[in-house]
């Protein structure tokens, strides 16, 4: 069956979006947020170009309706979580002198990755604007990192002009949940404000806020943008991460 021009254009858009999601492969990056949207986009392109294939596969009416219902519910849930994530990233009206928590991510050798540097920059901006505020640099060390994420964050903040005495390192965490749980322990031990400004990517703010509230903290956002070629996959991965957090 020969596809019509609108179907061909739609399929081309799907494949271009698929290429965008898979772009980080060129940097050796692979994660679930790149894979599940790409698979759905390829299926959508095939559906547009060869609808007869899907008609043969979904001959039974009950099966067609089951697939449609599952896709519809999944899409509605994903859009709902996406809207919630955007709202969480906009929650920036923190009380004066809140405690900053910088959430760690990949360190390249001893230097921050592009993503981590943007988080450090967001934290440094807040700390310069609030000279009495303190900061927790949170993140452990993985096998391919020469120093802990906390140590890297601390060094980058000092290089940005932040007084070392204002920075409390937390170098044991290996997940967002541990970032917030261990940071909450440090904050209480040091007698710091439990109003916290979370310095992380915009896509990460919702899940971080959920864990912060679970740990008895009141979260606000100091979000930063993700590099354009990384953003689609990380937002998609985080949608799955939020869904998993809510279900477990």
Residue map of PLM features:
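Transmembrane alpha-helices and immediately adjacent membrane-cytoplasm interface residues
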Residues: 43-91
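Lipid-exposed faces of alpha-helical membrane segments in multi-pass integral membrane proteins
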Residues: 9-19, 70-76, 80, 236, ...
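Membrane-interacting alpha-helical segments
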Residues: 233-240, 244-247
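Short, Lys/Arg-rich, polar N-terminal cytosolic tail immediately upstream
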Residues: 1-2
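Membrane-embedded alpha-helical segments of integral membrane proteins
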Residues: 5-53
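Acidic, low-complexity intrinsically disordered regions
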Residues: 16, 32, 58-61, 80, ...
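Structural signature of transmembrane alpha-helix termini at the membrane-water interface
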Residues: 19-26, 49-50, 79-87, 243-247
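A structural signal for short, hydrophobic/glycine-enriched beta-strand patches
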Residues: 80-237
């Amino acid at each position: 069956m020969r596809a019509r021009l609108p179907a061909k254009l739609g399929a081309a858009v799907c494949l271009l979006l698929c290429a965008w999601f898979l772009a980080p492969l060129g940097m050796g990056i692979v994660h679930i947020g790149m894979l599940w949207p790409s698979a759905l986009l390829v299926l959508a392109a095939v559906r547009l170009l060869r609808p007869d294939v899907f008609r043969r596969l979904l001959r039974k009416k009950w099966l067609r309706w089951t697939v449609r219902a599952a896709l519809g519910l999944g899409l509605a849930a994903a859009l709902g979580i996406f809207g919630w994530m955007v709202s969480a990233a906009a929650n920036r009206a923190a009380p004066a002198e809140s405690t900053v928590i910088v959430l760690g991510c990949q360190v390249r050798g001893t230097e921050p990755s592009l993503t981590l540097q943007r988080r450090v920059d967001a934290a440094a901006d807040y700390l310069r604007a609030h000279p009495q505020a303190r900061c927790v640099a949170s993140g452990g060390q993985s096998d391919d990192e020469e120093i802990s994420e906390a140590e890297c964050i601390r060094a980058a903040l000092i290089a940005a002009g932040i007084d070392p005495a204002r920075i409390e390192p937390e170098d044991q965490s290996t997940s967002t949940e541990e970032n917030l749980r261990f940071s909450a322990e440090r904050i209480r031990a040091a007698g710091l404000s439990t109003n916290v400004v979370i310095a992380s990517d915009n896509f990460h703010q919702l899940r971080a806020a959920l864990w912060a509230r679970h740990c008895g903290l009141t979260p606000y956002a100091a979000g930063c943008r993700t590099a354009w070629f990384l953003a689609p996959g990380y937002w998609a991965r985080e949608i799955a991460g939020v869904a998993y957090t809510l279900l477990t």
